[in-house]
């Protein structure tokens, strides 16, 4: 396995021996540092996907990697059958960092969403006193919360749910960015336990709701004794120009779901945070994870969050996001190919006019790669641009020129 293989050979290995559940951009990456990645041939690229916002702190951030290596040499895993020297420190740190009583540590974003759903239902029966097996959770159209069986049960994406039934009941789907729809459901459904929402719909193409939407929904939840559950796996940890996207409307979710950049991309770490009233419904043996809260994850997460704070990444994302969207708006004013831009902070999307060819956004991304910038389409005609938050203004402006030059080739 030490023989040097070409990109074509490595891609063929994946195609032959791996499940075909992804359609990657045809580049084989071998190294990363900051905003850059290199392929196996040594070509250097700007990374404008950031592993779906998992590497907000930049690839292989030296402080994070130093913590990872030091802890890996000392103790990697204990399970939760025993205490470990890192978990309590992390739990104190992360709850104070985000302003909650308790945290339940998990590994992946989907695991954290599943955990939040379980917490919500259990709270509904044990605290709110809903009749057994009646609890409903309201979700939004075009949501993306993961790909587990329960989560795809309330997806409207056929790729996510086709031939995976029967599906888990107990979910009510309403339009996103429509507080009146939530109000109607809360008035008509007496057994609603929670409202699960993305503050910005990332996989839907950085779809930003109207100003005031989150606060209206939060207030409705308060009035009906319903838990407001925010999935900030992709939008959280400084990506949108605030520590949390909910912070734009001063909304403090009853249950907060985090993942991805919680480790800076160094290892899988996710978390569910809430108050004592909600979190204390979980008792020994009722939920768990062998790897959740492991010593490496705990140590790495503390350092990853310290980096976000110390390097003021939220402020940087806010400032540079304004520059990026303004330049993309100028591009769209004269382009036949690019329609409009939307986003917050450094989570942005360029909408491509796909009238002539369904594959135009994909072809643009391939050409962007040739020009030294990696991005990937979502939903056929949307290109998401989300670089690591450590990008400098000079680097961002260089990338803007790459995007403009590439789009011009398709005019």
Annotate each PLM feature.
Residues 1-411:
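Conserved N-terminal phosphate-binding loop of PLP-dependent enzymes in the Aspartate aminotransferase
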